[in-house]
Amino acid sequence: MTTLAYNTIIERTQSLLKEFDEKFGIYEGIQNQEIQLIGTSGTVTVLGAVHLNLPRYNRSAVDGISISGPDVEKVIAKIKNMGDTGRRKHPCIGPLKSDLTISGCAIIEALLTFWHLSSPSVCFSSCPWDSHSCPVDRSDIF
């Protein structure tokens, strides 16, 4: 993916987030700690695996971890710097997830920068509702 394409995904995502935020006041809710960012599968599981430097994807190692905003940024930079060939060869990404992962990284980067998230809560993989590792207060879900 070119830098232009990556940045276009960020810009378009932030445009959609602006409309969403204006309608629902998400930024204010995040600042008041009433709203959390939760990632449940896909790109976030890859970010977790790469962050942990796993030799191959291991669901039990990734499930339930949290990654700080600065660490998410570092992992995204690492994945971007791999290039397509590097992502395809990476044991936690591979050829089937390479394109989706880099697109997902752009979307996550858009979320983090748009809402100034410095420490998103992240529950990886299945995020079972009865799991103690899931950082969601289930009483607030409707």
Task: Spell out what each predicted region is.
Residues M1-F142:
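Helical "lid/coupling" subdomains associated with nucleotide-phosphate turnover
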